[in-house]
Amino acid sequence: MTVLAVIAATLGAQPARAEGTLTVCLNEDIPLYSLHHGKETSGFDLKVAEAVAQRLDRKLVVQWFETKLEMDSSLTIDANALLSDKRCDLLGGYPLIKGTLGKPRVEIARLPGFDGGTADDRRRRVRLGELMPTRPYHRSVLAAVVNGTAVTKPITTLADFDGLRIAIEGGTLADAILMTWRDGRLVKQITHLIPERDDLLGRLESGAFDVTLVNLRRFDAYVAKNPGTKLKAAGFQHRIGFNMGLVGLATSADLIAAVDKAIADLDQKGELARMAAAVGLTYVPPRAPQIADNIAMSDLAEK
């Protein structure tokens, strides 16, 4: 293949961008954040994207993609690849952590699966750019969830987990927090379940365990599917959490500045909380600093 042919193939792989549109990449399977099944779409991130596009006087186009909800390099690389391939202007539902922003650790990566993608797209490699965030529009937190039949005492600190049967998904941030709390004081009460295989909240519902520490969005999604549930959010939220926003390439700084103004307007008018309530999501406002430091083991120590 000639050099010109290679260039033509690369340009041909990039989608055409219509004037007056705002294209946002959203994960297709994170209930209450963003969901796409057939013609059905829903979620808080989708509503925020719609509201931002309206304030920018643009038509929203959503590029749905597939990736796991993990705050690690997988999401970071997937997001960067989609943006660098011009699949979207921005990507929503992104954790604002220093290690997930800026220049990537690798220069080239494959694209994640995305709606409309072909076999050639799955094989292609994309040169990555520098990620730049918008201001956050909500916060992702870990919350104590209890079986309301078995646990009646208030849970206001991790000390209140003492004496309860604790279930936790192994290898997660919640696992690290509970296993290291007060030099392992809760270790003998903890049962580890396997993420994506064991039904953590279902096991809690059955009475096999008393309490867990889980992302509040997951609990909200469980309640939406099981309105008669015995499970309750006990009120305790761990201090370690992550602000969530949109992310784009640093070359889109002007667009990101405009989006910042739109998000600020939505926040000032109380629209963000109303949009979250409309999809059944407990709204937690962002906290300073807007961008969190990378988590170290020393951060897990009780403060």
Which residues fall in each region the model found?
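Ligand-binding cleft/hinge of the Venus flytrap
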Residues: 36, 49-65, 158, 171-194, ...
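Periplasmic-binding protein-like
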Residues: 27-29, 116-130, 135-143, 216, 263-279, ...
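Short loop->beta-strand "edge-of-pocket" segments that line small-molecule binding or catalytic clefts
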Residues: 23-28, 42, 129, 157-175
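Short helices/loops that flank or line small-molecule/ion binding pockets
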Residues: 38, 50, 68-91, 103-109, ...
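Extracytoplasmic small-molecule ligand-binding "clamshell" domains
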Residues: 18-102, 193
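A ligand-binding cleft/hinge motif common to bilobed small-molecule-binding domains
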Residues: 84, 92-122, 177-180, 205-240
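Flexible hinge/capping segments at coil-to-helix
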Residues: 134-137, 146-166
